[in-house]
Amino acid sequence: MADVSSTELKAAYDEVLADSNDTNWCLFKYEGKNKIVLSGKGSGGFAELAQEINQPSERLYAYLRVVSGDDESKRSKFVFISWCGEEVGPLAKANVSVHKASVKQVIKNIGVEVHYTVADDLNEEELMTKVRKSSGADYSGNKSTN
């Protein structure tokens, strides 16, 4: 298990959840082998987060708020991202899936979960397709003419 006791983790998660501010992502990193701490947060969406995540020698976890839906129904959706760069050693890579469970003790409201390992995987369009597919109802072809 990883150490996720830092109060900054929960505070950053709560900030991303809240619609009352512009913060739409937070990023957690390792401090040592097992302690997970806040690395950063921002309001620039997936594009900004992808720049922060793209670290080939790091293991990271991120939480992202996106807006999805159609003209009839826009809503916030939440994405949990795990990142394990291609330069991470085998033992550390193996710990990502185990430690992910610890991070999920802090991050609980997850609509979509993705795992990335290389920069080419960081594609916003593909991510939003996954978010839309997970969202359920789509009223875009069912417009009312009243």
UniProtKB/Swiss-Prot annotation:
Transmembrane segments: none annotated. Keywords: Actin-binding, Cytoplasm, Cytoskeleton. Residues 1-132 form the ADF-H domain. One of its GO terms (biological process) is regulation of actin filament polymerization. The N-terminus is blocked. The keyword Coiled coil does not apply. The keyword Cytoplasm applies. One of its GO terms (molecular function) is actin filament binding. Its main location: cytoplasm. PROSITE patterns: ADF_H. It is found in: Cytoplasm, Cytoskeleton. InterPro entries: ADF-H, ADF-H/Gelsolin-like_dom_sf. GO terms for cellular component: actin cytoskeleton; cortical actin cytoskeleton; phagocytic vesicle; site of polarized growth. PANTHER family: CORTACTIN AND DREBRIN, DREBRIN-LIKE PROTEIN. Binds to F-actin in a calcium independent manner. Binds to the filaments along their length. Belongs to the actin-binding proteins ADF family. Coactosin subfamily. This is Coactosin. The lineage of its organism: Eukaryota, Amoebozoa, Evosea, Eumycetozoa, Dictyostelia.
